[in-house]
Amino acid sequence: MRRRMGAAALEMDAAPGSSGQTQRRATVAARLPSQHWPQRSLLIVAVDAHTGEPIVFDRHSGVDLADAVTASTAGPGAPPHRIGDNRYIDGGYRSPENADLAAGYKRVLVLSPLGGRTRAPLDWGMHLAAQADELRARGSRVETIFPDSNSRDAFGVNLMDPSTRPPSARAGYDQGRALAGQLTEFWH
């Protein structure tokens, strides 16, 4: 499935340095709070459009933060993002949450904007329930947060639509305040 999605994206591939890729990267970079990788651990997942294999970018990858985010969000209807000789598509094709990357942590809080849904085959082990079960089997406490109805209504069907940001932020803030007590218990 990831290879098929990559092949579809490659059909729309823009030439290296084309104005489309340059503009998309500039848009992503402008939305970031910083152009530098944070010192704390941040893992950003993308999928190699040629092989379908996932790649995890971090501050040690030798890739600019803006490129990692642009690659990780090159979703349906967008060409893959080029980094060097490679082309990458949305890391959500691997898993919308990628919770398994938190293996080894005592507590794992998963924010699942798609409510745990995925199109990946069950035997891939990329469904959120399977990832959470594996984390628990390794000793992690896992808490999952799914959007409530107000949050789902606020972000609508296109998660990348910038016009939904303000209402989504308000709805998420309200949901977070409602869950604050539960999450305080989880962290202590």
Predicted region positions:
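Patatin-like phospholipase
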Residues: 1-188
